[in-house]
């Protein structure tokens, strides 16, 4: 795969249920592969786990979220001044809600990184930095996933979220949260949710 990386205009690295600080062999392989991408791919969009891998590979650090997690939705993400002027956020509102599912967060950014977005749970929701030949845009949230899919994931992981993750006390609390997300579905617009993807594709064209 590595010799062919230079054939691509860009790379999107998506999500995972792994925790990067667990430092397992499969995680180390992913970090190593990201470093190879930094040598060969000029434009990278790193989403959720992808951002955590990219940040770690570039010398930053990821830890368990100190202020909690996002289960299906991230509320009130706000763009920084740099975010407002970054091409990734062209036509985006300065504050928005978006699909998200994460328990970990970036706590130390790579050298020279530009902070693009944050909310009350995670300071780093959006990031732009360079490593090797690559320019990387990192998002902690998921513009590529619908809220409906997030609801399906919550239902699938319900027992884990209650018993292992301790994010909900019981099934009723899970259902209340799902109802909250379903209200967001009523007002969410696909084109707005996916603006970051559109803008990134325009960047690499």
Segments (PLM) and residue ranges:
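Short amphipathic alpha-helix with an adjacent loop that forms part of the alpha/beta core around
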Residues: 1-8
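Active-site-proximal flexible loops/turns
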Residues: 2, 21-22, 55, 109, ...
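Structural motif
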Residues: 12-14
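Cysteine-nucleophile active-site neighborhood
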Residues: 18-83
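Amide-donor transfer/coupling interface in amidating biosynthetic enzymes
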Residues: 79-205
